[in-house]
Structures are given as C-alpha cells and as structure tokens.
C-alpha cells in the first residue's frame, strides 16, 4: 500500500478545485507519497464508457440509469444556478423561476453530459422548455458565451464563475438537488491502493461537508 496507481476520471466542473485539493490531501497523508495518479476529464457518458473499458479505476460524475455494472456512491452536492450577462434584463433579479425564462436564448450542455438530463428535468418540472440555441460540453466555455451576451444558461455553481463578467442567480423554482457520485465497477478487483483512495474520498467529502 502507498506505492500503487489510480486511474481517475472526472467531469469538467471538478477540475479547477475539487480534484487537485483531494489528490493533494491524499498524497500528503503518511505513506501515500508514492501513489501515482493518471487523470482524464470528460462528460458523464464518456467517462462511464471508459470506466467500463477499464481505462479508469474510479470516475466522479453524475449518476446514469441502466448501468448495472457500476456502483454509484454520492459524495457531494453541487448547486445549479442560472447565469446571465451583467446587462441582461434578468440581472436585476435576486433569483429565477425556470417557468419564466423560456423566451431567452439558452446555451445548453450537450446530450452526453449527465447534467443535461438533470436540467431538462428541471424545465419539465415547471412545464417549460428552454429556447436552446447551441450546445456546449464545458462550463467555462458556456460562461464565456454568456459573458458576451450570446445567451443565458444553467451551470453548476463553481469557483471559476467569478472570473467571468456574469450575474449568478439562484433557482427559486423548482427545488432541486444535484449530486456528484463516485463510480466504480462492481465486479472488478480493487487494489489496496484503490480501496484506500476510495475511503479517503468519502472522509474528505464528509470532513469538508460535501457529502
């Protein structure tokens, strides 16, 4: 233990902050300094496909239906917010009801993204449909388009949003919770290093009130 390797895949929102802090904390634990990590990013669909082909040992992603080979363990909650440019008519609001935004051009996540199904479900819950003008896979790319007034969007509330000139609006309706999951193959051998890392992930998220 302490000298193995972990192949880790994760969705884009976790790249700037969560994964670096997590891994740094793990390798600085006594006995873990020689553990080697390989990293990859992608959409939930692509990550789970690569998990099943054993490119990855562990994936952090949204949950997916009909994946009987995969065990999903919730590790953290991620708030979804509406973002608009600073001059947008919605920018004066303190929160947004999704039933009231269908008239505005909407920048959506692509269909391969796990978050797309969640956002579609939120609109369905208020009997509404967004006016989708384009699809983008990555959060920062969406924020950049919103900043230049190409459209509005719904994204996870991540630290990187502060680097864009956008207004962040909480969603008042519908009520929602979005979770990030740790995904592993049910019937695959798990090395001592992998088991140790999984346990650390659970403790890290609990300690940081993410779970």
What are these regions (language model features)?
Residues 3-67, 135-136:
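Central regulatory/effector-binding core of bacterial HTH transcription factors
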Residues 5-9, 59, 83, 107, ...:
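Short, well-ordered beta-strand segments
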Residues 18, 168-211:
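A late-sequence structural motif
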Residues 43-48, 52-55, 61-62, 112-169:
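Hydrophobic hinge/microswitch elements
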Residues 67-79, 140-187:
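Beta-alpha-beta core module
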Residues 67-106, 191-192:
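Flexible hinge/capping segments at coil-to-helix
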Residues 105-126, 190-198, 205-211:
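Secondary-structure junction motif
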